[in-house]
Amino acid sequence: MVTWIRGEGLHRQAKEWAREHVKRLEEVGITPKLAIILLNDDPVELATQRRFASLKARDVREVGGEAEIYELHDVPPERRTKEALRLIESLNKRDDVTGVIIQKPVPPFVDERALFAALSPEKDVDALTPDNKKRLLDRFDLDNDVLPCTPAGILELFRMYGIEIRGKDVVVVGKGELVGKPLSVMLMQLDATVTVLHALSKEREPYVKRADIVISAVGRPPEIYRDNPWRLTGEMIKEGVVVVGVGGKVDPISGKWHFDVDEKSVAEKASYLTPNIGGVGLATRARVLKNLIRTSYQVARLVVSSRIVGP
């Protein structure tokens, strides 16, 4: 019988922890404020990103912080990078903004590298600036570092449920900058044997079939995409596997979510499985709160006093 890997516990703990630290930060004149930048004008991506952004903003406000969402998807393509860079420069300079998320993916005509190179590492909630990404190549501290939110949330779920990673064959489906790539590096740091599959991988099924852990981070459900769709089903996995579903998109017409993992068939064979609703999404939101608190302390040390001690 499958054990469901639920994110409610992590999310609840993170909110309680963040609420206490918001009070501490306010004592030194800092209120955590998250700025979220939306750049993608693709209807599916925009609908999905708006949903994610609203949930993150709600969490921040519920713990006593503030949140602002900036939508630049209506800016003409030829000007969008320039306008985004101007906004990032402004947010970097504002002492009241203590964390920034550039919601990914950005459209292909936007210079993504330039955006993350311009973002202050101290305010980088997703840990995607060049300086923050380097941390993953050495050692990382799951409890104290600002780390990519979804990968760190998944590792926290594994720890909470006692799921062993060391020495396990792990397949990560998807090599995106937000989840697949950083997660695969983090898993290798934890002594897993990692295989990364993507759209050009040949014969993906044999790798998936023999994996001890499968993490699906594609986000191309067949209900929405005809080009390179992906759906993980029960017939593709072995008995007793651990399955983590990350990818999901919102249909901009119906407003309905569609996911990477066929929950019903996979649950019949998996030993552990994240539910499509209430699993990785909540763990990610928990990590956003933790990272925002940490970036807020970094800002406090810069603008108030270097002697301020945070988590």
UniProtKB/Swiss-Prot annotation:
It catalyses: (6R)-5,10-methylene-5,6,7,8-tetrahydrofolate + NADP(+) = (6R)-5,10-methenyltetrahydrofolate + NADPH; (6R)-5,10-methenyltetrahydrofolate + H2O = (6R)-10-formyltetrahydrofolate + H(+). One of its GO terms (cellular component) is cytosol. It comes from the Archaea. It holds the Pfam family THF_DHG_CYH_C. The keyword NADP applies. Pathway: One-carbon metabolism; tetrahydrofolate interconversion. GO terms for molecular function: methenyltetrahydrofolate cyclohydrolase activity; methylenetetrahydrofolate dehydrogenase (NADP+) activity. Keywords: Amino-acid biosynthesis, Histidine biosynthesis, Hydrolase, Methionine biosynthesis, Multifunctional enzyme, NADP, One-carbon metabolism, Oxidoreductase, Purine biosynthesis. Its EC number is 1.5.1.5, 3.5.4.9. GO terms for biological process: L-histidine biosynthetic process; methionine biosynthetic process; purine nucleotide biosynthetic process; tetrahydrofolate interconversion. Belongs to the tetrahydrofolate dehydrogenase/cyclohydrolase family. Homodimer. Catalyzes the oxidation of 5,10-methylenetetrahydrofolate to 5,10-methenyltetrahydrofolate and then the hydrolysis of 5,10-methenyltetrahydrofolate to 10-formyltetrahydrofolate. This is Bifunctional protein FolD. The gene is folD.
